């Protein structure tokens, strides 16, 4: 099996077709999730006043909705786009309430189960059409991604080194890929992580795409050659390995880690609220059942602890931190936890501006960019702010496609255009790092 997806590559490695068949046909690879989303809806609302916002907050609490955006009920305010996943039974109550109060709404997804099953059907079809090579235009399970990592580690020794920095709560290895020409004892580095929130599948898809493009174009693209010769990229394709696996086997829209709380039945911590920077302040929840639960203490999650330890150890050489999320079409930089201007604002803002301009040049997709607190919302305890506060001067968070039409169910047909445009943005940021700011 060709793990670079290019039959002309001389360094490609092949595995028996039966290996891929087993991975496609094994339980959990394409899952109906026990019909758990039958009749569920995704509804968009934009409150036109603070009174409407307060009314929505109250009923969201009562109905225990799953907010797709924003990530917390506390963020619901006048003019804020609110995408709500709600069960079939609760949707009747919500729709009756909206009609009674004359709050405008739009149903984005009429039957979530059908949307999920359609996603799974397309996955199976696309995988079967490409048994001869690793397909970068489909979503892959954790097992597939780990096999991909190990194979590139064996077949690309001049550019790739894969290693583990620890284990997850459920005991899974936390794999990192070091990507770059092994030419110097000391090189500056860029950190890239994807999949800190389990349901955001486009993130891990981009991490894989980035690696493929870097390896395939290293000898032909002067910019890529310069990047890999002068920098190491530390890439974590799946940050939240337990949650990502769970999103493939049990709950497609799971967000958090899978750790247990001794006092509550609810599981998991928001891995992007668990960092030691204004921990559990605004935009985070202290309740274990909330999607933005900050955890019992900073770095309580072994996944967060392992990455924080690695970044601390290498912070003198790591000059950029890039984290990939979905969805909103934004490029964000610090601060998230406060309304303030970072000291190197002009340099970071220029890099962000050039990146979104480059991104837009590919398919015309518009991204907003700016400080996270002003562009998205105030949130505390996140990885981007932590990286910046710990001496990494370029810290960015991408919110990839789309803006809500598909939400977390971004179709596989949009993986390639999303990754192609994002690739250009990342190259722009990296080249700016090499040319401009220290």
Swiss-Prot record:
Its EC number is 3.4.17.-. This is Carboxypeptidase A6. PANTHER family: CARBOXYPEPTIDASE A6 (PTHR11705:SF18), PROTEASE FAMILY M14 CARBOXYPEPTIDASE A,B (PTHR11705). It is an enzyme of class 3 (hydrolase). The active site is at 399 (proton donor/acceptor). In brain, highly expressed in the olfactory bulb with lower levels in other regions including cerebral cortex, hippocampus, hypothalamus, striatum and medulla. Within the olfactory bulb, highest levels occur in the mitral and granular layers with lower levels in the internal and external plexiform layers. Moderate levels are found in the epididymis with low levels in colon and spleen. Not detected in adrenal, liver, lung, ovary or testis. At embryonic day 14.5, enriched in eye, ear, osteoblasts, stomach, skin, dorsal root ganglia and throughout the CNS. Zn(2+) binds at residues 197, 200, 325. It comes from Mus musculus. Residues 138-433 form the Peptidase M14 domain. Belongs to the peptidase M14 family. Its cofactor is Zn(2+). Glycans are attached at residues 89, 153, 344, 428. Disulfide bonds join 266-289. Keywords: Carboxypeptidase, Cleavage on pair of basic residues, Disulfide bond, Extracellular matrix, Glycoprotein, Hydrolase, Metal-binding, Metalloprotease, Protease, Secreted, Signal, Zinc, Zymogen. Residues 1-30 form the signal peptide. Binds 1 zinc ion per subunit. GO terms for cellular component: extracellular region.
């Amino acid at each position: 099996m060709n793990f670079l997806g290019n039959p002309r590559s001389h360094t490609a490695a092949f595995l028996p077709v039966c290996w891929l068949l087993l991975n496609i046909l094994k339980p959990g690879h394409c899952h109906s999730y026990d019909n758990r989303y039958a009749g569920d809806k995704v509804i968009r609302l934009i409150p036109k006043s603070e009174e409407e916002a307060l009314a929505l907050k109250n009923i969201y609490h009562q109905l225990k909705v799953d907010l797709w955006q924003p990530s917390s009920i506390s963020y619901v305010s006048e003019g804020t786009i609110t995408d709500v996943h709600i069960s079939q039974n609760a949707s009747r109550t919500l729709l009756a309430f909206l009609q009674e109060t004359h709050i405008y709404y739009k149903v984005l997804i009429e039957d979530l189960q059908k949307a999920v099953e359609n996603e799974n059907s397309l996955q199976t079809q696309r995988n079967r059409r490409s048994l001869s090579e690793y397909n970068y235009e489909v979503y892959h399970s954790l097992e597939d991604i780990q096999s991909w990592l190990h194979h590139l580690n064996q077949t690309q020794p001049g550019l790739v080194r894969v290693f583990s920095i620890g284990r997850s709560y459920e005991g899974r290895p936390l794999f990192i890929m070091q990507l770059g020409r092994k030419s110097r004892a000391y090189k500056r580095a860029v950190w890239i992580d994807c999949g800190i929130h389990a349901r955001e599948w486009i993130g891990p898809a981009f991490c894989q795409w980035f690696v493929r493009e870097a390896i395939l174009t290293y000898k032909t693209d002067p910019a890529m050659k310069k990047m890999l010769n002068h920098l190491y990229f530390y890439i974590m394709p799946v940050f939240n390995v337990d949650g990502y696996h769970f999103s493939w086997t049990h709950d497609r829209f799971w967000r958090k880690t899978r750790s247990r709380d001794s006092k509550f039945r609810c599981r998991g911590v928001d891995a992007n609220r668990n960092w030691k920077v204004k921990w559990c302040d605004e935009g985070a929840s202290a309740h274990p059942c909330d999607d933005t639960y900050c955890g019992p203490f900073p770095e309580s999650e072994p996944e967060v602890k392992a990455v924080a330890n690695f970044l601390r150890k290498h912070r003198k050489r790591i000059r950029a931190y890039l984290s990939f999320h979905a969805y909103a079409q934004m490029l964000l930089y610090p601060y998230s936890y406060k309304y303030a201007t970072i000291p190197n604002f002009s340099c970071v803002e220029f890099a962000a501006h050039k990146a979104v301009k480059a991104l837009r040049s590919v398919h015309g997709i518009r991204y907003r960019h700016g400080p996270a607190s002003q562009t998205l919302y105030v949130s505390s305890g996140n990885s981007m702010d932590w990286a910046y506060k710990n001496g990494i001067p370029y810290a960015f968070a991408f919110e990839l496609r789309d803006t809500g039409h598909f939400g977390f169910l971004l179709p596989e047909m949009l993986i390639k255009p999303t990754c192609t445009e994002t690739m250009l943005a990342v190259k722009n940021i990296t080249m700016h790092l090499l040319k401009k700011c220290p």
